[in-house]
Amino acid sequence: FTTIHNYVDVNTMILRKGAVSAKKDERLLIPMNMRDGSLICTGLGNEDWNCSAPHGAGRLMSRKDAFDSFTLSAFEKSMEGIFTTSVARDTIDECPMVYKPMEEIMNNIKETVIVEKIIKPIYNFKASENAGGKKRGKE
């Protein structure tokens, strides 16, 4: 299955910005963060939600605030148990603490999807725009 976000559904004329289709019995993926993984869900077709669901956990803060708020060591600690080569100063803006908690998201989406499975990462990779370049964030 595929999960597309930020588009116009020409069949229903619904604009989904930051959302994905969650029609009745439709399978979809909602990513949480690089530590907690993703939710595999089945849509409920809730018209009050425009048959939609969020396309991800949602950020708690801006990228700049993330660089100002978290240290590389805190990021490293949060990723213990998951193999990754992506924990670096220039990816602090993607650390798990920057996103809303999975439990909160799962509670908030009960009216639009059924969470079938939580898939946890064993390996995580994030490309870095600034690899080898400007260093941002705190040590």
Predicted segments, located by residue:
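Domain-length cofactor-binding catalytic modules of enzymes
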Residues: 1-139
